[in-house]
Amino acid sequence: MRAVADKLALQGFIVIMPDLASGLGPNGGNFDSFKYPDDLAKALGTRTVPEKIGLLRAARDYALKLPRANGKSGITGFCNGGGFAWESAAEIPGINAAVSFYGAPPNLATMAKIRVPVLAFAGDDDPGLAPKVAAAAPEMQRLGKTFEFKIYPNVTHAFLEHQTLGENAVATLDSWPRAIAFFKRYLNAQTSSTNTRTN
């Protein structure tokens, strides 16, 4: 994920990558102290949503105090982090845009609290997620939210990490510029609109 943060920074964004596993690892360690992904997932599961949102809010607040900050902030995440991006769009005042890569949309009560544009990506070879992202579109429209999404054919979960499977590399080449353009649209200029679209 550090490589992704670096790619965002190269686009001119201030990027903070909070370690939501800080203090949860062996001997109080962080993300890097977990040897196995399953152990990391279990540890993260012990942290409540309010705790995670608090860590994300603290990272955002820190970023906004940096000299180059323009007063706007966005959030992106991948898998569980993609779900946190959805949650943050609802729970953190002052977030201006959210991009979710293969993250689960929230429940309707949380969705109703979303105040910012959301962009979501998924692959149709991710049967536990793709239908949920597609189902979020009419709900977001009904709620008057600005929502864009793209579900890629023959693409798996975590497609940015698994480039050799199916059409994952194609999805990566398409989704990344879309995410950058989305952030530039909502973080660099005053924009007020409500729409739901896929293309």
Show where each model-derived region lies.
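Short beta-to-alpha linker loops that shape the active-site pocket of alpha/beta-hydrolase fold enzymes
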Residues: 20-24, 104, 155
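Short beta-strand/loop motif that positions the catalytic acidic residue
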Residues: 114, 120-122
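Short alpha-helix in the alpha/beta-hydrolase fold that links the catalytic acid
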Residues: 3-4, 130-140
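C-terminal catalytic histidine-bearing segment of alpha/beta-hydrolase fold enzymes
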Residues: 141-199
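Acidic catalytic loop of the alpha/beta-hydrolase fold
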Residues: 125-130, 157
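Primarily recognizes the serine-hydrolase "nucleophile elbow" in alpha/beta-hydrolase
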Residues: 53-115
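Serine-hydrolase catalytic machinery in alpha/beta-hydrolase-like enzymes
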Residues: 1-65, 161
